[in-house]
């Protein structure tokens, strides 16, 4: 089937064969085998496959976007064809690169924002320090307008209540708490998500994605249905049981297996090894990204047939492995067995 061949295909490489005569030093003509160009049918089938919601997806945060770099690492085009969703983490915007992966490969590209503060322009009061429903909703609409202006296909909310802000101290803001500073932060987040949900996500009736990562289960349980996916930062996960415990917390607050994506960090040394040492149910050890790809959560007393998928933070660092994106490709192939 086309779909199976698409997902299992690898980038073809130019092969040069040089034959030397055994009796003299004359070099025979160089024979170069050029990679076969992918057909229009291949790309049409690839796009159709990605439009369907019947499979686990590979999701990656892409950092250092730079199409002017010395190699392809900084380009979205370098990402394997079979990756479903790229979320831009950092870098330099390039419309041509963006539209190529969207229109040719059918890859959906979102952008990530920290969902904790509300810009002053959307705050009320004389000192612009009062949180209002109107301001929250205007902020949500402005994000959707920005998304459309730049040609993105969704928004990923980095949402980490209780965790440390890289700038120091816990993440703090009207949408994320902490509760002793913003006791109504979950109510504010509800207003924010529901307004976004009018334009993006499964409630909107559009193809635009609404994703939340970090601590998806902290939002009110009734908000889970507003998101296409929740991405848990299961960084350095040591075992299947660790993944299950993470999912249990989400399931208890309204999340379903097919919504949940488990992500490993490829920032630092993990990129070269596919993650950390991870114990499977049968006692064998594999790289943690592979463990996430193989994982199927227990839900309502039985093993799910599929989950949302798996992914990586700083996916672009897998480019340097051989072949390029080695661990990403392996994970996608494993997830093809889940239906």
Tell me the role of every PLM-derived stretch.
Residues 23-339:
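Secreted glycan hydrolases and related glycan-binding modules that recognize and/or cleave
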Residues 2-11:
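Bacterial N-terminal signal peptides that target proteins for export
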Residues 18-22:
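C-terminal motif of bacterial Sec signal peptides marking the signal peptidase cleavage site
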């Amino acid at each position: 089937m086309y779909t199976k061949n698409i997902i299992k295909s690898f980038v073809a490489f130019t092969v040069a064969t040089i034959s030397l005569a055994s009796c003299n030093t004359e070099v025979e003509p160089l024979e170069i085998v050029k990679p076969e160009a992918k057909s229009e049918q291949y790309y049409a089938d690839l796009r159709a496959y990605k439009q369907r919601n019947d499979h686990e997806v590979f999701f990656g945060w892409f950092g250092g976007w730079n199409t002017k770099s010395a190699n392809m690492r900084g380009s979205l085009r370098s990402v394997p064809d079979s990756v479903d969703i790229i979320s831009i983490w950092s870098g330099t915007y390039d419309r041509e690169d963006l539209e190529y992966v969207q229109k040719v490969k059918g890859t959906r590209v979102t952008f990530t924002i920290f969902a904790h503060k509300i810009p002053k322009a959307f705050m009320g009061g004389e000192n612009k320090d009062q949180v209002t429903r109107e301001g929250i909703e205007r902020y949500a609409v402005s994000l959707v307008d920005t998304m459309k202006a730049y040609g993105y296909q969704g928004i990923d909310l980095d949402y980490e209540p209780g965790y440390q802000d890289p700038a120091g101290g816990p993440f703090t803001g009207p949408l994320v708490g902490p509760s002793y500073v913003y006791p109504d932060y979950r109510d504010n987040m509800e207003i924010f998500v529901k307004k976004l949900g009018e334009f993006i996500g499964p409630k909107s009736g559009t193809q635009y994605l609404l994703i939340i990562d970090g601590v998806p289960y902290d939002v009110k349980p009734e908000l889970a249905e507003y998101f296409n996916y929740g991405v848990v930062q299961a960084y350095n996960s040591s075992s299947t049981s660790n993944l299950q415990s993470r999912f249990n917390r989400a399931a208890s607050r309204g999340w379903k297996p097919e919504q949940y994506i488990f992500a490993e960090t490829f920032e630092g040394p993990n990129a070269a090894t596919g993650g950390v040492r991870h114990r499977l149910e049968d006692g064998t050890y594999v790289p943690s990204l592979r463990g996430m790809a193989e994982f199927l959560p227990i839900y309502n007393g039985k093993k799910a047939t599929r989950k949302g998928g798996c992914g990586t933070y700083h996916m672009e660092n897998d480019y340097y492995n051989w072949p390029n994106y080695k661990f990403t490709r392996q994970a996608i192939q494993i997830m093809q067995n889940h239906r």
